[in-house]
Curated annotation (Swiss-Prot):
The keyword Phosphoprotein applies. The lineage of its organism: Eukaryota, Metazoa, Ecdysozoa, Arthropoda, Hexapoda. This is Protein king tubby. GO terms for cellular component: ciliary membrane; cytoplasm; nucleus; rhabdomere. The gene is king-tubby. InterPro entries: Tubby-like_C, Tubby_C, Tubby_C_CS. It comes from Drosophila persimilis. PANTHER family: PROTEIN KING TUBBY, TUBBY-RELATED.
Length: 459
């Protein structure tokens, strides 16, 4: 009995240490999950009870057996009663031992699964889409009766879905014909885009004309471009300076190369070169499209085109500014992004803004002065805390399959249903990037590159 007691004490100490480790692990949930995916239960008590663990208790095991040959079953003998009481007591002790071992094994399995996960991501499993039913619920544990349907990327979440956290399968239809919207003033209105229940309202974009011209043209209204970014970290220096490739996704697994980007090695701040020539990612290349430059702390990024800053005839233009603030939901919470873009004219062309021209004011200076006449301000959609998955979630409509602090969606404050851009992880070095009007491929790719870069003041 002393050996069993000692073992119980050791297992109890290990269980307490593991519980403390799990509590510390969950105390800083900084990952953004896709709400249309299901994550395994965080607590081992919620696991299925179909799996059993068996243990050998040594010479004392026969006492708990119902076929114990040494057990005396007499009604009037006090000795028999004592043996029966001892057998019952030993049986309860053995059951507690088995229960402790079972809990210990579940905790070890739980910690092992956490340690195998990536530092920035955790794998998730896809929820099977529910068929339309009178009493089906959007969320796994939601009890609110609703009629569900097959979600599509064209659909977005409304504020009621975020309030009720009923976001696992929510995909309401975008409202048509808004009365007033700041998008119309800046040429950013997306109300003309057709809406549907998933089948074909919004067409998928394709490359038109030359690649170098296409990547700089704003996306037409009502067109969605589904892209994929791959990160190449093979080679001597690519562990610290990987190369990123942007492809436009096509049917049957086909893809079209659009842009490539890499971080310059000899630069005081983060500086990315973007080119439409995958074989020559340099400023002197014919396919050079622009660059992304950050400040010292990595909290502010500016996107430029391929123009020359010293030229007076055609100075370098500002394409976007990305600002990262401190985490919005805690020290290790999701990032808070602000993206400032040039405004759009009536013919769906960008307003030309150049910080290199002494006669003009750059995008960042206009934003600091609160001069919003020729610029448009976007923010990342705030993730919602999900009690079931113990994480922050966003509805990516199946386009994102892993959690990461890099996952985000860009919207305008006055029209949160219109997702201008979304970006998220699907595997270790593969990410999806979808964008709409008024972004172009160069702007969207540069915004994604800023998400990859390290941020001293935000981490």
């Amino acid at each position: 009995m002393s050996a069993i007691s000692s073992r119980n004490q050791k297992m109890e100490q290990q269980r307490q240490l593991m519980e403390a480790y799990i509590r510390q692990k969950r105390a800083s949930p900084g990952m953004v999950q896709a709400s249309d995916l299901q994550i395994s239960r965080p607590m081992s008590g919620m696991r299925s009870n179909s799996r059993e663990l068996h243990a050998y208790d040594g010479p004392m095991q026969f006492i708990s057996s119902p076929h114990n040959p040494d057990q005396i079953l007499t009604n009037g003998s006090p000795v028999g009663g004592t043996v029966a009481m001892n057998s019952t007591r030993n049986h309860s002790n053995n059951m507690r031992t088995l229960s402790t071992i079972s809990q210990e094994a579940d905790l070890i399995e739980e910690i092992s699964s956490h340690e195998l996960e990536d530092e920035e991501s955790s794998p998730v499993t896809v929820i099977e889409q529910q068929q339309t039913a009178p009493h089906s619920a959007n969320s796994t544990h939601s009890q609110r009766p609703s009629t569900t349907r097959q979600p599509s990327f064209n659909d977005t979440l409304d504020e009621d879905d975020y309030t009720n956290r009923n976001i696992a399968g929510a995909a309401p239809v975008r409202p048509v014909g808004l009365a007033s919207s700041p998008y119309k003033e800046a040429g950013l209105d997306g109300s003309s885009m057709e809406t549907s229940n998933g089948a074909g309202g919004e067409s998928e974009g394709d490359v038109i004309g030359n690649i170098d011209q296409f990547v700089m043209q704003p996306a037409p209204q009502g067109v969605l471009y589904k892209c994929r970014i791959t990160r190449d970290r093979k080679g001597m220096d690519r562990g610290l300076f990987p190369i990123y490739y942007l492809h436009l996704e096509r049917d049957y697994g086909k893809k079209i190369f659009l842009l490539g980007g890499r971080k310059r090695k000899k630069s005081k701040t983060s500086n990315y070169i973007v080119s439409c020539d995958p074989t020559d990612l340099s400023r002197s290349a014919d396919g050079f499209c622009g660059k992304l430059r950050s400040n010292v702390f990595g909290t502010s990024f500016t996107v430029f085109d391929s123009g020359n800053k010293d030229s007076t005839d055609s100075p370098r233009l500002d394409l976007a500014v990305i600002i990262y603030d401190t985490n919005i939901l805690g020290f290790k919470g999701p990032r808070n992004m602000t993206v400032i873009l040039p405004g759009m004219t009536e013919d769906d062309q960008r307003v030309k803004i150049s910080s290199a021209d002494p006669k003009q004011t750059g995008i960042l200076d206009l934003y600091k002065m609160k001069n919003m006449d020729n610029i448009v301000e976007l923010h990342n959609k705030t993730p919602v805390w999900n009690d079931e998955t113990q994480s922050y979630v966003l509805n990516f409509h199946g386009r994102v399959t892993q959690a990461s602090v890099k996952n985000f969606q860009l919207v305008h404050d006055s029209d949160p249903e219109y997702i201008v851009m979304q970006f998220g992880r699907t595997s270790e070095d593969v990410f999806t990037m979808d964008y709409r009007y008024p972004l172009c491929a160069m702007q969207a790719f540069a915004i994604a590159l800023s998400s990859f870069d390290g941020k001293i003041a935000c981490e």
